[in-house]
């Protein structure tokens, strides 16, 4: 997998109260492209952060319905990836 494709897979880390608590258990959350697979996500995280990934779980988050100036619209769907790294390794999401 080339470097350019890897950089396009991971869009942003998800930083919330829940994901901060999960980081104590070596789990990290990322917003990823909707069309990427678990294998691609695993390869991207291992290459970018130099960690060993044990497990990747993904879910599609449905976009919310919003009203703007009386018109109903919707935000796009997006994919969330929960990545579990090996014991003793960590990812510094504040730098990403």
From Swiss-Prot:
It comes from the Bacteria. GO terms for molecular function: rRNA binding; structural constituent of ribosome. Pfam families: Ribosomal_L23 (PF00276). Transmembrane segments: none annotated. GO terms for cellular component: ribonucleoprotein complex; ribosome. Belongs to the universal ribosomal protein uL23 family. This is Large ribosomal subunit protein uL23.
